[in-house]
Design a protein with these regions (language model features):
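Short amphipathic alpha-helical interface segments
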Residues: 2-54, 61
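Generic structural signal for hydrophobic core residues of well-folded globular domains
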Residues: 26-30, 70, 98-102
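Short, amphipathic alpha-helical interaction segments positioned at domain boundaries
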Residues: 85-119
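Alpha-helix boundary/N-cap detector
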Residues: 13, 17, 54, 58-61, ...
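Short amphipathic alpha-helical interaction segments
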Residues: 53-73, 86
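Amphipathic alpha-helical interaction segments
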Residues: 17, 21, 65, 86, ...
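Long, low-complexity, polar/proline-rich intrinsically disordered regions
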Residues: 121, 125-129
Length: 130
């Protein structure tokens, strides 16, 4: 199933990685706000070996699009945005409720903390956007 999703939505693995990273960081800092640099995140993902690209800047632009989507979907709030940097990012009320909810006896926050594989990240993202 993951192969079908990747074929139909080729940027989904990047979206999953960004969504899980942002949600983990905001969850860990909650209720404090964090700043996110898409360029720094792009370099981190490239160094982890999961994403190949011609330019970290190109990847940073795609990461920025994913963060914008998370905000428009009501999962995060941010206080400001300049180029590929986001300021005062925090969990939304909706995301906090999802992370605290029990799903099959396991809350989503603990699933997010353990989501290291693409399959685990996809499962978390599906629950976040449901």
């Amino acid at each position: 199933m993951n192969d079908t999703i990747s074929k139909n939505l080729p940027n989904m693995p990047l979206f999953q990685a960004v969504a899980c990273h942002v949600m983990t960081q905001t969850q860990t800092a909650f209720p404090n706000k964090i700043d996110i640099s898409c360029s720094t995140l792009a370099h981190m993902l490239i160094n982890q070996g999961g994403f190949n690209c011609d330019s970290p800047l190109d990847l940073a632009i795609e990461i920025s699009a994913a963060i914008d989507w998370l905000e428009k979907a009501g999962l995060i709030w941010f206080g400001g945005h300049e180029l590929n940097d986001y300021f005062d990012v925090t969990l939304s009320k909706h995301a906090l409720a999802k992370l605290l909810s029990d799903i099959n006896g396991n809350n989503l926050a603990s699933q997010l903390a353990k989501a290291t594989t693409s399959e685990q990240q996809l499962a978390v993202v599906k629950q976040l956007i449901a």
